[in-house]
Curated annotation (Swiss-Prot):
<comment type="similarity">
    <text>Belongs to the GtrA family.</text>
</comment>
<protein>
    <recommendedName>
        <fullName>Bactoprenol-linked glucose translocase</fullName>
    </recommendedName>
</protein>
<keyword id="KW-0448">Lipopolysaccharide biosynthesis</keyword>
<keyword id="KW-0472">Membrane</keyword>
<dbReference type="InterPro" id="IPR016480">
    <property type="entry name" value="Glc_translocase_bactprenl-link"/>
</dbReference>
<feature type="transmembrane region" description="Helical">
    <location>
        <begin position="75"/>
        <end position="95"/>
    </location>
</feature>
<feature type="transmembrane region" description="Helical">
    <location>
        <begin position="96"/>
        <end position="116"/>
    </location>
</feature>
<dbReference type="GO" id="GO:0005886">
    <property type="term" value="C:plasma membrane"/>
</dbReference>
<keyword id="KW-0812">Transmembrane</keyword>
<dbReference type="InterPro" id="IPR007267">
    <property type="entry name" value="GtrA_DPMS_TM"/>
</dbReference>
<feature type="transmembrane region" description="Helical">
    <location>
        <begin position="12"/>
        <end position="32"/>
    </location>
</feature>
<dbReference type="GO" id="GO:0009103">
    <property type="term" value="P:lipopolysaccharide biosynthetic process"/>
</dbReference>
<feature type="transmembrane region" description="Helical">
    <location>
        <begin position="45"/>
        <end position="65"/>
    </location>
</feature>
<keyword id="KW-1133">Transmembrane helix</keyword>
<dbReference type="Pfam" id="PF04138">
    <property type="entry name" value="GtrA_DPMS_TM"/>
</dbReference>
<comment type="pathway">
    <text>Bacterial outer membrane biogenesis; lipopolysaccharide biosynthesis.</text>
</comment>
<keyword id="KW-0813">Transport</keyword>
Length: 124
């Protein structure tokens, strides 16, 4: 039982919960850009990412890692995760893969890599 309690108070659990909201925001913006504005997957993914990542950055700085949200940290986070987001979208466009596959794959990949980058580099 102690392990479950520790997990529920860990920075990863907080990061995961914020990630759920982030994912809903990202997917909603992606959908609107892709279907209503006729953006490609690359552009749709980066726009959705920027909206969601801005929310996540401030929420994670405060709740998950308990550090100040500086401009330098914000730009490092946005650049790192944004480049990854855009590359996923462009690659999946080139491979003619479904937009939903782009969203699922990027969401899973960004949860793991994003947490590691945030914990050990961006918010240290």
């Amino acid at each position: 039982m102690l392990k479950i309690g520790k997990l529920l108070t860990s920075s990863f659990f907080s990061y995961f919960l914020i990630g759920i909201v982030n994912t809903a925001l990202h997917w909603g913006v992606f959908y609107a850009c892709y279907n209503n504005l006729a953006f490609g997957q690359g552009r749709s993914n980066i726009v959705g990412f920027i909206c969601a990542a801005t929310f996540s950055f401030f929420a994670n700085a405060r709740c998950s890692f308990k550090v100040s949200a500086t401009k330098a940290r914000y730009f490092i986070f946005i650049f790192f995760m944004g480049a990854m987001s855009y590359l996923f979208g462009v690659l999946f466009d080139l491979l003619a893969l479904s937009p939903i596959f782009t969203l699922f794959t990027f969401s899973l990949f960004s949860l793991v890599l994003g947490y590691c980058a945030s914990k050990y580099f961006i918010f240290r």
